[in-house]
A protein has these predicted regions:
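An active-site-proximal structural segment forming one wall of the substrate-binding cleft
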Residues: 20, 76-105, 115-153, 157-198, ...
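N-terminal carbohydrate-binding accessory modules
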Residues: 16-102
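Short, solvent-exposed turn/loop segments enriched in Gly/Ser/Thr/Pro and often Arg
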Residues: 108-110, 147-155, 202, 240-243
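Extracellular glycoside hydrolase catalytic/binding regions
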Residues: 19, 174-198, 202-313
Length: 313
């Protein structure tokens, strides 16, 4: 979905070399100092989003990549996207963000850059991420890895690279096994990397009609169990159903390093203060867990400024 800013509802930032962890309702560093993420989401870098390209119709990654290939051929398409991704975000940009008070990047991932087919694993995704992670290290910034496009797609929207018809992550068990294996692969690679602050396991899942919340919880449990076989260190972030905002069936926490996340945009159906005070802070207070605003913005600077101030209270 649309996003520019990320935020965590939890003090000044001092970059440390150890892993972050949860401590009650906050996230802390290796010195038990409270951390507040003030971050930027890299929409359109690895996972293409149609509205960011002003693409007419259903602008999924696959649709737009195919359109470019139809225009210039596969070899030129591959060359174009290689250059595009190499220049979309650079250390100069990260330094600029750091100098302007940001301390985190949320990076949307597409499973195909790690596993183009089930049980096939490649390094393409790591070759994209590693230079950015190193640049973040050099500029005192954290990275949150976000599975934006899961095998089969976790909703029917273009930004999950779905077919526009069915969220096949939920309807096909093979895709759930595939997602689990992809996250294990990523977690094993980054298990000793403290610049990676957390794994955001599924961006904005939407259960298909007829599927209850247990279907989403099962996937989260399988993924987390798989991650923990290779990586006991990193925080895991789970988003609720219906684009991240319905946590029915996902409480209480089922991992010691778990953070709950929601997304909020102008024009939502619920008043911000009511939503925040009655529901989302209720999760944090009742279950003593951190709460993270994974996306907010971006079509009103005035609204965005006000909501940022509200979340920082």
């Amino acid at each position: 979905m649309r996003y520019i800013f990320i935020h965590i509802l939890l003090s000044s930032f001092v970059f440390c070399s150890g892993f972050l962890k949860t401590q009650g309702r906050i996230i802390v560093d290796e010195n038990d100092e409270k951390i507040i993420f003030k971050g930027f989401g890299l929409g359109g870098w690895v996972v293409l989003e149609g509205y960011m390209w002003n693409y007419p119709g259903f602008g999924s990654t696959t649709t737009m990549e195919n359109a470019v290939e139809d225009l210039i051929g596969q070899d030129k398409k591959d060359e174009f996207f290689s250059l595009y991704r190499a220049n979309y975000i650079t250390e100069k940009d990260i330094k600029f963000l750091s100098q302007n008070g940001f301390n985190a990047l949320r990076i949307p991932l597409h499973y195909k850059h790690f596993s183009p087919s089930f049980n096939e694993f490649i390094y393409d995704g790591f070759e994209l991420l590693d230079p950015i992670i190193n640049a973040c290290r050099n500029n005192n910034m954290y990275v949150i890895l976000d599975m934006h496009a899961a095998p089969g797609a976790q909703n029917t929207s273009d930004f999950s690279d779905s077919d526009g018809q069915t969220a096949k992550l939920f309807t096909e068990y093979s895709n759930q096994k595939w997602l689990t294996s992809v996250w294990r692969y990523i977690a094993e690679y980054y298990s000793n990397e403290p610049v990676v602050a957390a794994y955001d396991l599924l961006n904005e899942p939407v259960l298909p009609w007829g599927y209850g919340p247990q279907a989403l919880r099962n996937i989260y449990e399988w993924v987390i169990d798989s991650i923990r076989t290779v990586d006991p260190n990193h925080v895991v972030i789970i988003e609720g159903n219906w684009y991240g905002n319905d946590h029915t069936g996902l409480l209480p926490p089922f991992d010691d390093e778990m953070v709950y996340s929601f997304h909020h945009y102008v024009g939502g159906s619920t008043d911000t203060a009511t939503m925040y005070n009655q529901y989302r802070t209720g999760i944090s207070l009742e279950y003593n867990v951190p709460l993270w605003v994974g996306e907010f913005g971006e079509n009103s600077n005035y609204w965005g400024s006000n909501i940022k101030s509200f979340f920082e209270r």
